[in-house]
Amino acid sequence: SVSMLVLGFIFLGARSYANDVAVIESEMVATAKWVAGNLPSDVLIAAHDIGALGYFDSHELIDLAGLISPDVIPVIRDEEQLASYLDQRRADYLIAFPEFYPILTEGAEIIFTTHSAITLTFDQKNMVVYRWKTP
C-alpha cells in the first residue's frame, strides 16, 4: 500500500539524515573547532567544505568548491593547477578528505585528523588538516 511505502521512505530518509548529521559533527564540526583553537589567526586555509569552518572559525578561507572563491572554478578538477593556485594564493593549510584530492594530499604533512570511528564505518577516510608548503 501507499502508506507503507511512505513510511518506508520516511524511515530510510530519517536514517540517512541521522548518518549525515553524525558525519558532519564528527568530521567537519570537529575539524573546524580544532582549527579555531589550534591554528594561528593569520593563516590562510584552503578547504573543500567550508560550512563548519565558516561557522565555528574566523580564518581567511580559500573555498576549493568555488562558492566564496569563484576564481578557483576554472581549475577545480585539475589538482596540478589547484596546487599552483594554492601556491599563488600562499595558502598555509589544506583541509580535505584525502580521497577528494589524492595528488594534493600525497606526501603532505598531516597536522590533524579526526580519527572518527563513525566515518570509518561508512568505509570513508577521516578529514585531515595538512600543512601546505608554499614555495
Task: Briefly describe each language-model feature range.
Residues 1-2:
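Membrane-interfacial entry segments at the cytosolic side of transmembrane helices
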Residues 5-54, 60-99, 116, 121-135:
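Membrane-embedded, lumen/periplasm-facing catalytic core of multi-pass transferases
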Residues 100-105:
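Short, charged/polar "capping" segments at the starts of alpha-helices
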Residues 107-119:
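Low-complexity, intrinsically disordered Gly/Pro/Thr-rich segments
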